[in-house]
């Protein structure tokens, strides 16, 4: 399939929105890691905002790219142990144990 369908767009916007709500910055991080965690979180929020803007403008290719970048920042934070995602390996690329 070579199309970004409305169903797929809604699915990924919803998934990333829910994932963003679930993320918590890990406790007891070093100053450096806390700064990094906040940057990752801000980048994710910014890309999600961009995705919604692009979708509203009818630019679905950039919207789909932006929502995937948004989620990638969340995954990066989870994999790096900057974010507590409650070992959710459905919404995030992490081990469940």
Which residues does each predicted region cover?
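Long, charged/polar, soluble alpha-helical segments
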Residues: 1-97
């Amino acid at each position: 399939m070579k199309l970004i369908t409305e169903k797929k767009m809604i699915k990924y916007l919803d998934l990333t929105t829910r994932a963003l709500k679930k993320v918590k910055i890990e406790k007891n991080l070093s100053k450096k890691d806390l700064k990094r965690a906040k940057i990752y979180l801000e980048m994710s929020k910014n890309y999600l905002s961009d995705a919604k803007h692009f979708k509203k403008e009818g630019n679905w290719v950039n919207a789909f790219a932006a929502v995937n970048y948004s989620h990638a920042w969340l995954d990066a934070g989870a994999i790096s142990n900057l974010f507590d995602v409650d070992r959710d390996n459905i919404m995030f690329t992490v081990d469940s144990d």
